[in-house]
Amino acid sequence: MTSYTDKGEKPERGKFLNFHHIKFWVGNAKQAAVFYCDKFGFEPLAYKGLETGSREVVSHAVRQDKIIFVFESALNPGNEEMGEHMIKHGDGVKDVAFLVEDCDFLVKKAKERGAAVLKEPWVEQDAGGKVKYAIVQTYGDTTHTFVEYLGPYKGLFLPGYKEPLFRDPLLPKLPSGHLSFIDHIVGNQPDDEMVPVSDWYQKCLLFHRFWSIDDKQIHTEYSALRSIVVTNYEETIKMPINEPAMGKKKSQIQEYIDYNGGPGVQHIALNTSNIIQAIVNLRARGLEFLSAPDNYYESLREKLKTAKIKVKEDLKTLQELKILVDFDDKGYLLQIFTKPVQDRPTLFLEVIQRNNHFGFGAGNFKSLFEAIEKDQDARGNLTVLTAQNQSVSKAFQ
C-alpha cells in the first residue's frame, strides 16, 4: 500500500469542487428510483419527463443529504444510444458529474491534453437560474459532466426539472438511511488498463495519485487485484481505479468486466457518521449486504490488542452487523458492502465511516474478495481464468 503526498501541478484556473450527482441509465427509471428510496433511504427530489416537456428521456432525481442520484430511461422505442447501452451494460452508472469552477477553462485544458470532449460547454436556464455544462469521455462508455452554476441557482435541482409527480407516503415511516455524502467512486478496468486510465485523470484533469495497492498485497487463494486512487487537487473527489491481476480463477473484477461488457463504475461508497445506526436501519429496510465470517472478528480482536488506536464502537455489534474494520496507527474506518443491486453481478454500493483514516480498507480487501467469491461461486462464475483479448478504451488510446 502506498500513499502519495505530491499533488502535482496546481491548476492555473478552475476547480473541481466535489461530486455533483451520479446519473444511471436504467430500463425503468421510475422503478429504479423507488428501489433506492425504499432500500437506501433516498427521497424524491425532482422529475423531468413527458409532463415537463421532455419528450425523449425521463429523469427521476432522488436525494439523501448531499448525495444525488439521477435515474434516466428512454421514452421512445427508437432511442438507439440508450437501447444499445442497456443491451451491453444493463442498469448502471452512465455519468459521474462534478461541480466545477470555470467550466470553459477546464474543458479547454482537458481537450489540449487529449481528452475526448463529447459535448462542448453549453448553458441551460429556467426560472431558478443558469447552469453551464460540458461532457468528457472517461473509461468505457462512462462520462463526466462538468456542472457550473452561473450565479445562485434557486431551482429544485437543475434547469428543466420540476417537482416529483408522486411522493410515497410509506417513506417517512421508514428509518433514516443516515447516509451523508459520496466518499469515493470505483471504476473497474480490464487487465493492463488501470495505469492508462489513472494517467488520463492526471494528464487531462490534473488529478494526482492519492493511494495505490498491488496484487502482492491484495489476493486470495484464487484471485487478486491492483488499484490506484486518483483525486483532484483539493482532494475532495476520490476515484479508485481497479484492474484484475492473474490468479488461479476469475476475479470478481473480471466477472464485472465480463457482465458489464467492459469497464465501468463498480461501486459507489457513501459516507455516514453513524455506521451502526445506518446498517441497522438499512437492514430493516431490506437491503442485502455481503457477510463476513466469525473468524474475521476473532482475528480482528487479536490485532486490536496491540494496535495504537482504539475502536470506539462495540465489536460485538460490529460482528452482528457484519461491518468490517480497517486501521493504522492514526485511525480506523468501518465499512460494509451491499450485494449487487441489479441482476447482473456489476454495480454495488458501500457504506463507510471514517475515524481519522483516509485509506480504502486495504486490510479488508481479502475478506471482501472471499465474501464476493462465495457469491461468485454460487453464480457459477468462480471459474479457471483463461486468456482473453481485451482492447483499451477509446478515450485512452
Curated annotation (Swiss-Prot):
PROSITE patterns per record: VOC (PS51819)
Cofactor binding summary note: Binds 1 Fe cation per subunit.
Keywords: Cytoplasm, Dioxygenase, Endoplasmic reticulum, Golgi apparatus, Iron, Membrane, Metal-binding, Oxidoreductase, Phenylalanine catabolism, Repeat, Tyrosine catabolism
GO-annotated molecular function: 4-hydroxyphenylpyruvate dioxygenase activity; lactoylglutathione lyase activity; metal ion binding; protein homodimerization activity
Location in the cell: Cytoplasm; Endoplasmic reticulum membrane; Golgi apparatus membrane
Cofactor: Fe cation
InterPro entries from the UniProt entry: 4OHPhenylPyrv_dOase (IPR005956), 4OHPhenylPyrv_dOase_C (IPR041735), 4OHPhenylPyrv_dOase_N (IPR041736), Glyas_Bleomycin-R_OHBP_Dase (IPR029068), Glyas_Fos-R_dOase_dom (IPR004360), Glyoxalase_1_CS (IPR018146), VOC (IPR037523)
Chemical reaction(s) catalysed: 3-(4-hydroxyphenyl)pyruvate + O2 = homogentisate + CO2
Pathway listed: Amino-acid degradation; L-phenylalanine degradation; acetoacetate and fumarate from L-phenylalanine: step 3/6
Lipid bilayer topology: Peripheral membrane protein
NCBIfam families: 4HPPD
Family: Belongs to the 4HPPD family.
Name this polypeptide is given: 4-hydroxyphenylpyruvate dioxygenase
Species whose genome carries this gene: Danio rerio (Zebrafish)
Name of the encoding gene: hpd
